[in-house]
């Protein structure tokens, strides 16, 4: 049996500081703009009382939220659309598997937290390509609106008891 693999030897030269470099030419202009191998990215998103820890792994677009599929965790199509928005904005649908752990808050808050976490993770994957579109769509901004506290002497945060002039 003969081994028919073609091996290409790369030649490296050493400069006066002892740093090795290649004398080969730069990559061609038609090289892909996005990196071929993408490392997994982690990020955290928060919304109201909800916190989502997100991990993006190169894959086929599978979602795992607290050990369940996206459809079973968020049965409402609106929440699914909110969560998927960063992928639609960056045109990367189906390129990453999402593994998320969410706790606290309600369903809408959790969907918002997951959206922010996914957007931050996509930003971490490729800042130059993804950040402008995510920033323009407002997906990298934390929504700071939270429940206003109840004040003493009032029925709710702002609702006062009925006032009688006489």
From Swiss-Prot:
The entry's keywords: Ribonucleoprotein, Ribosomal protein
Biased composition (Acidic residues): 1-16
Pfam family, one: Ribosomal_S9
GO cellular component, one term: small ribosomal subunit
Residue ranges that the Swiss-Prot or TrEMBL entry lists as coiled coil: none
GO molecular function: RNA binding; structural constituent of ribosome
GO biological process terms held by the UniProt record: translation
InterPro entries on file: Ribosomal_Su5_D2-typ_SF, Ribosomal_uS9, Ribosomal_uS9_bac/plastid, Ribosomal_uS9_CS, Ribsml_uS5_D2-typ_fold_subgr
Region (Disordered): 1-45
Highest taxon of the lineage: Bacteria
Gene3D superfamilies: 3.30.230.10
Keyword Ribonucleoprotein among UniProt keywords: yes
NCBIfam families: PRK00132.1 (NF001099)
Entry's family note: Belongs to the universal ribosomal protein uS9 family.
PANTHER family xref list: RIBOSOMAL PROTEIN S9 (PTHR21569), SMALL RIBOSOMAL SUBUNIT PROTEIN US9M (PTHR21569:SF1)
Name listed for the protein in its UniProt record: Small ribosomal subunit protein uS9
